[in-house]
UniProtKB/Swiss-Prot annotation:
Membrane topology reported for the UniProt record: Multi-pass membrane protein
Protein name as annotated: Phospho-N-acetylmuramoyl-pentapeptide-transferase
Main location, first listed in the record: membrane
TM segment ranges: 13-35, 81-101, 106-126, 142-162, 171-191, 201-221, 228-248, 268-290, 336-356
Catalytic activities: UDP-N-acetyl-alpha-D-muramoyl-L-alanyl-gamma-D-glutamyl-meso-2,6-diaminopimeloyl-D-alanyl-D-alanine + di-trans,octa-cis-undecaprenyl phosphate = di-trans,octa-cis-undecaprenyl diphospho-N-acetyl-alpha-D-muramoyl-L-alanyl-D-glutamyl-meso-2,6-diaminopimeloyl-D-alanyl-D-alanine + UMP
Keyword set, alphabetical order: Cell cycle, Cell division, Cell inner membrane, Cell membrane, Cell shape, Cell wall biogenesis/degradation, Magnesium, Membrane, Metal-binding, Peptidoglycan synthesis, Transferase, Transmembrane, Transmembrane helix
Keyword Electron transport attached: no
Family annotation (InterPro entries): Glycosyl_transferase_4, PNAcMuramoyl-5peptid_Trfase, PNAcMuramoyl-5peptid_Trfase_CS
Family named by the database record: Belongs to the glycosyltransferase 4 family. MraY subfamily.
Reported function: Catalyzes the initial step of the lipid cycle reactions in the biosynthesis of the cell wall peptidoglycan: transfers peptidoglycan precursor phospho-MurNAc-pentapeptide from UDP-MurNAc-pentapeptide onto the lipid carrier undecaprenyl phosphate, yielding undecaprenyl-pyrophosphoryl-MurNAc-pentapeptide, known as lipid I.
Record-listed E.C. numbers: 2.7.8.13
Species this protein is from: Prochlorococcus marinus (strain MIT 9312)
Amino acid sequence: MIGKIKKFNFKSLLILNTFALIATSYLFNNFIFIGVYTLFFFISLFTTKNGIKIIKKLNLLQNIRTEGPANHLKKSDTPTMGGVFMVIPFLIFLLIININLGSLKLFLLLLTIFGFFITGFVDDFLSIKKEQNTGLKTKEKFFLQSIIAIIFIFLAYEKDLINPLITVSDSWQINMNIFTLPISFLVLVGISNSVNLTDGLDGLAAGCSGIVFYGLGTEILMKEQQELIIFSILCYSMSGICLGFLKYNSYPAKIFMGDTGSLSIGAILGSIALLTNSVFTLSIFSGIFIIESLSVMIQVGVFKITKKLFHNGKRIFLMAPLHHHFELKGVKEQKIVENFWKINILLVILGIVLKINL
């Protein structure tokens, strides 16, 4: 049915996601889920709309890399660092909850998200200051992410907050054993960077993130563990935030989230998945993010190998990440984004169906 919809835009996604939240709230007999989603959707609308004015006054505008698709040059001077207006309301909400509950899990989550948020903020700020598309060097950014991730993982593992068993179903669990720490690192840093790589077309990362947060929140609810319900509430609040931001980020974008937003969103997804033992289903829900990231690794890997062997590097894609390949193939930006959204919705449905039937 989704595939037959000719125009699947922001309004279509908003209606579908909201309907799904209403249905979920009804099925689980708890309307706080649709309530928190709706509240943060409107908070995000307000903060983003006013944030655009603030960013323009501060002259915090996007620099576009010249080696990218030519049609992206018109995006230059679009306000960026919009992630500030997505993440700060969420961090305040998380801080208030943690003050009331005094949860170590929530405290670690708060510190980790804040760390990735600062990393993204510094990267965006330096990019604007240097008038380039990149701020921190790749190695510098990865180093900062790694330090934050390692601190989170070791503290969580030390306090038995990370389960070494990846739960596929109630009867099927995979024991990570000695690979618990490296896999946890891969999940946290990998998803964070994957969301960052996906954020290359108007509305792509924000829309997909809103969908994934809904899926993750619902999967956590299906565990039927009272102590985990708060994480579903956090996921639904982020789903609302992403869709509120999407109103101004969908084509033609009036604001970009920047690394401030994308790195933080990935960190929220990865850390919540680790703390709730939802890594398996997150890997399905985040299929778009993972494919985008893999396309870059394949492109770079093949180029380096062929250059070493044949002294002439070959490329698999016209450009990576994958969304740029389709752009250079002549597919319109809006159509690429709409199709990726549709695929992401199907992945969330697949993940939930597997959760029910396995």
